[in-house]
């Protein structure tokens, strides 16, 4: 059982949220950002990019990068305005009159639903990565003024993305859920939603867990992008007047203008003037051209006066349909990033007479509300009742091309309405039912949702047969129409699908294509990650070899180092040849070789640490065992001897008597006078003096003499004795050793 999430599929940005611990939480994408650009692109290598990666190539690859897809979803080509068609990529009409997006890189065309499905799949994958479990269902939000065509197209996009669309939710309603979740007092809320490509106004009654939509209105062809286009046109006209070049005819220059306009719009929300600098915007045969100008907030507001007037009409209509006055509104909730513009906030203040509530994040509040609705459907959130409405009137065409409304706008859903119709001619055996959506009186001025025929009507005079037509709208706002001949009982039922511009066969084909391309994308991503991992491991291995050479020398672990160097050469060769199989083997081999080298290095470090830090402990334990004489010190002693030599005090190992210091002799300044030397077991080591404080019987070990540093061989120091019977060489003529030895002890030799 997978998780159900809430998705705000926006024109400019999209957001995904989920219920965690009973509270909604927005999920950040792989880039660490909570909003994902609603942009899809195809790179020059054929890789499909979604989000920020696609947005980065808008200027360099405008023909293969698609933004603002939400404006085309669920619409036919003839319904598009000239403004919406003015995009850097190619939008064309297919033989059925639907909108198709041309992708030159892949030499194919995409339906807007397919492009939207790529965005939804990207969001679902990010949520699955965060949650650690698959995401199978979603509540997707749409503008409240979306017609049935656009709602059905959004549902199809979710199906193509591999998601079960649990609910299609109006964006203002979702925002009210997020705003009023913890509020128990009765309030009247006005939600002002100005997104990147759509505009909605909804009036709701909120209290005690009940969210009742009273009225909704809007404009699906008005949004923040229209404000950007005003700046684009202003910049293009200025440049055309100064240089005689229309930048709107150049795809790359147009995209740079769009990005500069969006940046200027954002900056003017916080400052009163902004500078626009676009170097090398174009070039002539003589020289490159630059665009440098300054735009003030007052000039920007003057450019957008007509857009503000277009927003006033839906706002007043929503209040009128709800039978409310501006003073009846308790709270105004702003939704959408474009509501940050000061002129929009001032418009709300002037019409409502109340300061807008800015406690909610306008970019995330819709996704949070969608997550709450997902929690309601999953049983995680209780005691909440949502009563939504249909945004537009629904009816059918009658005699004379007049629209007969069966369900008026702002009717609470789900709802079912019926009416009785008859034939227009004598002996008519078939009637065609034409479903319409809109507010115009004539059928041709409204949106056609579809047609179907009811056949088998018995011949009869005009007006005698009775045909009952029923309209049924579910909680998602999806319409189902049925026609019943009351004479014969013959019934014809149809779910309106023509609104989506896609047949069921096309939807299934796109679902298979999306899964196929998703698998190809995963394989390509895995190859790229493998190559990156190999390059990273090569760099780490080379750095490790350099460090070991500096720390332990060139001859340390020579065989293991040669193995690593050889594997690195093989790995680089596989990378150059793009041999995936060899790359896997070389990667595993290099990891094993590096592990072996690190093990040997760690062992060497442990040995060195043991000789240093743990040496005093070793000496202590050795002295407790009684064998510490030999390991007492490793440095030179005061007589020039090495403490690691054989123990000269152990009389049990030889029969040679030892001699001690003669206390009976008068003290002399010579430190070696009066001492006796014993023969050592190693001929190459120096003699150790033995001084006995108890009369020379050797029963008590003398205390060591204080250190005097490492001795140097002077004339007054004793020579190295040889155990052989040969006497030492005589000194040079005129010189004699002052060794302090008793000449009477000739038996020593």
Curated annotation (Swiss-Prot):
Region (Disordered): 643-749
Keywords, ordered alphabetically: ATP-binding, Chaperone, Nucleotide-binding, Phosphoprotein, Stress response
Residues annotated as signal peptide: none
Keyword Manganese set for record: no
Keyword Signal appears in the UniProt entry: no
SUPFAM superfamilies with a match to the protein in the record: Actin-like ATPase domain, Heat shock protein 70kD (HSP70), peptide-binding domain
Biased composition annotated in UniProt, kind: Basic and acidic residues: 643-653, 661-694, 711-724
A Pfam family hit: HSP70
Family annotation (InterPro entries): ATPase_NBD, Chaperone_DnaK, Heat_shock_70_CS, HSP70_peptide-bd_sf, Hsp_70_fam
Comp. bias intervals (Acidic residues): 740-749
Modified-residue entries (Phosphothreonine), positions: 198
GO molecular function, one term: ATP-dependent protein folding chaperone
Similarity comment: Belongs to the heat shock protein 70 family.
PANTHER family per record: HEAT SHOCK PROTEIN 70KDA (PTHR19375)
Function: Acts as a chaperone.
Annotated protein name in UniProt: Chaperone protein dnaK3
Organism: Synechococcus elongatus (strain ATCC 33912 / PCC 7942 / FACHB-805)
């Amino acid at each position: 059982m997978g998780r159900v999430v809430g998705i705000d599929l926006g024109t400019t940005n999209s957001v995904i949220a989920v219920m965690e611990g009973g509270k909604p939480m927005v999920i950040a994408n792989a880039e660490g950002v909570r909003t994902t650009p609603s942009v899809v692109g195809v790179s020059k290598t054929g890789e499909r990019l979604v989000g920020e990666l696609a947005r980065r190539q808008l200027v360099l690859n405008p023909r293969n990068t698609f933004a603002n897809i939400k404006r085309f979803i669920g619409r036919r080509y003839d319904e598009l305005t000239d403004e919406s068609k003015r995009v850097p990529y190619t939008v064309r009409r297919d033989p059925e009159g639907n909108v198709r997006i041309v992708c030159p890189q892949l030499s194919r065309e995409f339906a807007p639903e397919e492009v939207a499905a790529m965005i939804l799949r990207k969001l679902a994958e990010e949520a699955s990565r965060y949650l650690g479990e698959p995401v199978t269902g979603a509540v997707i939000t749409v503008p409240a003024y979306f017609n049935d065509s656009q709602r059905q197209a959004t549902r199809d996009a979710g199906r193509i993305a591999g998601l079960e669309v649990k609910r299609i939710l109006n964006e203002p309603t979702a925002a009210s859920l997020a705003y009023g979740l913890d509020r128990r007092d009765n309030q009247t809320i006005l939600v002002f939603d100005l997104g990147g490509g759509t505009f909605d106004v909804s009036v709701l009654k909120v209290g005690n867990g009940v969210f009742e939509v009273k009225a909704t209105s809007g404009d699906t062809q008005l949004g923040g992008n229209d404000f950007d286009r005003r700046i684009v046109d202003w910049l293009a006209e200025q440049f055309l007047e100064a240089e005689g070049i229309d930048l709107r005819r150049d795809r790359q220059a147009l995209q740079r203008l769009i990005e500069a306009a969006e940046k200027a719009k954002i900056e003017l929300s916080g400052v009163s003037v902004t500078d626009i600098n676009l170097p090398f915007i174009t070039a002539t045969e003589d020289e490159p051209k630059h665009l440098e100008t300054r735009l003030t907030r007052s000039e920007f507001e003057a450019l957008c006066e007509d857009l503000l007037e277009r927003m006033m009409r839906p706002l007043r209509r929503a209040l009128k349909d709800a039978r409310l006055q501006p003073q009846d509104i308790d709270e105004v909730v702003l939704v959408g990033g474009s509501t940050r513009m000061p002129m929009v906030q001032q418009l709300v203040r002037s019409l409502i007479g109340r300061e807008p509530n800015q406690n909610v994040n306008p970019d995330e509040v819709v996704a949070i509300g969608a997550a709450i609705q997902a929690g309601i459907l999953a049983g995680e959130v209780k005691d909440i009742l949502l009563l939504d409405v249909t945004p537009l009137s629904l009816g059918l065409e009658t005699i004379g091309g007049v629209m007969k409304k069966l369900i008026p706008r702002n009717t609470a859903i789900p709802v079912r309405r019926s009416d009785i119709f008859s034939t227009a001619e004598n002996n008519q055996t078939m009637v065609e039912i034409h479903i319409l959506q809109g507010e115009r009186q004539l059928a041709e001025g409204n949106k056609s949702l579809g047609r179907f025929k009811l056949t088998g009507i018995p011949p009869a005079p005009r007006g005698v047969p009775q045909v009952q037509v029923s309209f049924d709208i579910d909680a998602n706002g999806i319409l189902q129409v049925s026609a019943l001949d009351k004479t014969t009982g013959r019934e014809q039922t149809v779910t309106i699908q023509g609104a989506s511009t896609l047949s069921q066969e096309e939807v299934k084909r796109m679902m298979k294509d999306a899964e196929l391309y998703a698998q190809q994308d995963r394989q390509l991503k895995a190859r790229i990650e493998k190559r990156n991992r190999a390059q990273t491991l090569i760099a780490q291995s080379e750095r490790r070899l350099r460090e070991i050479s500096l720390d332990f020398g060139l001859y340390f672990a020579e065989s293991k180092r040669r193995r690593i160097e050889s594997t690195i050469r093989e790995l680089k060769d596989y990378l150059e040849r793009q041999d995936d199989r060899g790359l896997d083997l070389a990667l595993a081999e290099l990891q094993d070789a590096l592990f072996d080298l690190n093990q040997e290095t760690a062992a060497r470090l442990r040995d060195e640490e043991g000789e240093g830090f743990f040496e005093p402990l070793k000496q202590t334990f050795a002295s407790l065992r009684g064998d510490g004489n030999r390991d007492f010190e490793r440095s030179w002693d005061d007589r020039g001897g090495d403490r690691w030599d054989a123990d000269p005090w152990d009389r049990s190992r030889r029969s040679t008597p030892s001699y001690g210091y003669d206390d009976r002799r008068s003290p002399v300044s010579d430190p070696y006078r009066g001492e006796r030397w014993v023969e050592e077991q190693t001929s190459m080591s120096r003699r150790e003096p033995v001084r006995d404080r108890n009369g020379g019987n050797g029963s008590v070990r003398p205390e060591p003499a204080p250190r005097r540093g490492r001795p140097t061989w002077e004339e007054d120091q004793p020579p190295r004795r040889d155990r052989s019977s040969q006497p030492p060489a005589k000194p040079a003529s005129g010189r004699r050793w002052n060794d302090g030895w008793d000449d009477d002890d000739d038996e020593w030799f």
